[in-house]
Amino acid sequence: AMDEAEQLRAVQAGYVNFYADDAINPYIALAARGPWVVTLNGAVLYDAGGYGMLGFGHTPAAVLDAMARPQVMANIMTPSLSQLRFDRALRKEIGHTRGGCPFAKFLCLNSGSESVGLAARIADINSKLMTDPDGRHAGRTIKRIVVKGSFHGRTERPALYSDSSRKSYQQHLASYRGEDSVIAIPPYDVDALKQAFADAETKGWFVEAVFLEPVMGEGDPGRSVPPAFYAAARELTRSHGSLFLVDSIQAGLRAHGVLSIVDYPGFEGLDAPDMETYSKALNAAQYPLSVLAVNERAAGLYRKGVYGNTMTT
């Protein structure tokens, strides 16, 4: 009979694991409910971690019951009443503190990283408009601003905005050789943020976007953005003509029990970002869904043909 370590190696022998060996749980899960996990060897473990996902615990009955009901599944090319219901549900949950949802439109995708990738695609469209020969910032070099320790996903453009992972990318990826488009400033240093935008004017840069987490998820887990820094980012991006994304995927509902940063204490009177992403707070860890919420300006920037998604409703 195999011991547990041998069992682990056997069941994962056919896979490449993304993560460090010491990050792999030292058991094989056989069954689970709520915070309890039963292992293949018969141990019963209390697991409240859930990797940021399992707020409802393992195999949540209410969620699984809802998913088991017959659904008319259609992507965005086929109008469906489920789309109207979801739109209304989102608008009900965003803007509790300000009399209504400040976002004009929603775009539905699968993974969280995909929604950030679409936000970056919209920012890319804006960058072309701004830096084309007839643009406001014609011919300028494109830069991007994040805070040190930021995390926005591991797919192509979200990875570029993720300072917490950058060391590994620079070490192993040819595409990062000489890559210097990202300005990472000390977390929540308003003066440093203002200086970055001042440098953009003197050095001929166009700042494509500022990407910001309400609560850091990787670099300094749990550290939250102060309203003053958010307000500065909102004003500076607007004045410069760039876009401001708040990536609320890692924050979920855990920060203040609300979906959007616009309802956080201290943020009620501040203008909404151009774009905001959600995922883990929406999909109950059971259904691959993420959402990019956009204001009128960002919605108007989207161009048909620059993106597509098959599976989301």
Model-inferred region functions:
Residues 1-313:
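Conserved N-terminal phosphate-binding loop of PLP-dependent enzymes in the Aspartate aminotransferase
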